[in-house]
Amino acid sequence: MTNSVLVLGAGIAGMRAAAELVQQGFEVYLLEKKSRIDNNWESIDHLFPTDECAACSLQPLLLELFNNANAKILTSTELLSLRGQAGDLTAEVLKEKDEDKGGSKEVLSVGAVIVATGQEEDKGETHEHLGYGMQALAERLGLELDDKGNFKRDLENGHPLLTARKGVFVCGGGLGPIKIGESVVRACAAASQAASLLVPAKRNGLTKPEENHFFPVKAEDEPRIAVVIDQGDADVKDLLDLDELATYTQSLPGVEQVELTARASDGSSIKDLIGTGDFNRLIVAGPSPIPHEGLFQRHAAEADLNPYLLEMVNLHNQCARVHSSDRKQATEKAKTLMNMGVARVRQLEPLEELKFDITQSCLVIGGSISGVACAVRLAEMGINVHLVTSSPEQEKIRESDHPLIKPLPAKLSNSENVIVHTDAAVEDSQGCLGNFIVTLNQPGEPETLKVGAIVLASAMSIEKGGDGSPLEESLALEKDSDGFYKSTQGIMNLLDFTTEGVFNCGAARTALEIEVAVLDGEAAASRAACILSSPSITRSPVISLVVNENCDGCAYCIDPCPTRSLTLLEYVHRSAVKKVAEHNKVTCIGCGICMSTCPKKGIFVKHFRLETFSEMVKTALKASDFQPSIICFCCSRCAYPGADAAGSMGIQYPASVKIIRSVCSGMIHPNIVIDALTQDGADGVLLCGCHPGNCRSREGVLKAQARTEAIDLMLEDFALEPERFRLEFIAASEGKKFAKVIEEMTEELSALGPNPYNKT
């Protein structure tokens, strides 16, 4: 049996199915006929009906696939044939090179295939029948079409994702026209089907990260910086005087070597430089850190440099392309950006990925159709399950004659991986992702369970049922006006809650027909399996850290934390009661909202310290030759990609703006804004974040918005005009809007005149 899955089609369903499977320990080939995997999304601005930014919603999927060595992305590639049996299939594919050279054939060994091909709107052309590509694909897959032009189902149980050929599953547009949210759910369900089939081979032959032996680097070591400048593609390499830029960069403090390279992304120049052991910091100048930072961090790690000692300077999208009409001006700005990059990399410290052991079992609350389907699917994926249900729910499942439900009771009773808790109710939950401690109130003695994930499939099995129950409070659950639990991660994650490791499906989230309820449960099983398929989880070290010496226990940071990662701790220190914030490393997402609320510098985010922001601001303004000078803070999720979008489209805007990337707009402390204006002499400060409702940190942009009033009052105290500070919501697709905002703010600041606090 082969631990590989071939996913046909890299649309939203294909990417989601692929991302699910690589997280669960499978190798994935993501095959796309077109030249790029996100090809159609450039034409989509916002998603209906939630009005989410399409590019912002897509970004996490792209990063998951780009940054996972077990995801093999095959673009400009078509399937020619599929032979063999489920678990041991051979797929022949044709990868196109160009029109003159033709293509090259390749044979892939896979255990299963997920068909996630999309659909296109009719262009008014004449066709013999709709779905004109389906017949050819069906023949290559060894399938037949039904009278509606869809793939024939497995006749044994009529499951909508199972085709007549075992080991070949279908989701997305392959099922017909379907809404985005439903397509995502079906993609997760299809992934669970493939994972169940290939359980015996899971994790076999995976590309595992090599054990790193990084050069020892201490924070106090004098920086020895190597700089690699990527010349870029033909459209950018002549827009900057790169020789002049390299000479200038060589003169900056701590820079010991600068190299120009035609393409830094292959990693060879980085490995040659860093591999000598002569350098303890690295700057890659050229590509955007989104989505390239993960790639260059891997190159750094392969050369034995801690990946968090890397800084990226965005010359292509945020300098060359947006100032292409004036090469000299663009080159001067590039020098400033390099200076800012050096200022930041000098302050970086080596960090280690965080690894936590987890409990590889799942609690499913509710014996609804979705709950039972979820429990059965998890068990078939090799994961231990505790199913909390009631006698009426069990009876209803047993009495059903529906072909999808009828086999479920027997599968439950025959599985060694499922423990059913009948007529029990979940009273409370403590802990967090990977290690929840749950109390069951059941006939006889109460029972305490330890699980790694929780799936809600019904509201009926929750003690005290209504809003405000201990479980709802501990898991931060919220109900809508109809009494269903609200999923809070947007249309791309209908089954996810704000609290990581807790998922929503079936009767807990909405009313569903039987077939859809089964898919909902299977999809939730896939989401939980992404956590539970490994005995440990690895998290980014870019999280908050409490400075006990500075923290006075004011608790200003506690309530604003969107993940409830902070609590107040009291203890006796030197015969006195000491209060200090205590931090949960597992649940922290590094948004920095806590850092921006602290008046005493008692907490900071690793890799994004306040001092680093301040130093970059000083450097940007010290080297600035353009007036008025604008410091622009952009969040990584939406606004920074939005600025990149302006570069991709070649939209011009004034070179007076210098962009500084932050994790979230909510991490920018008001003092940074005021200091930039009153001490460093910026003419204006622009803070760009996600649109409300699209914030990865849930509330970060709302916190930033709430602080604008305080910033306005501080500006008034310093006799500065309110126009010198501006907050804007920029989606990842809104490059035109970003450029327009820069134009408008530059005009406003020009009318106001120079900042009176500018000492130069």
Report the location of each language-model feature.
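Thiamine diphosphate
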Residues: M667-L677
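C-terminal functional segments of enzyme domains
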Residues: I730-T760
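Short Gly/aromatic-enriched secondary-structure transition segments
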Residues: G647-M649
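Residues forming the flavin
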Residues: M1-S629, C635, Y640, Q652-S665, ...
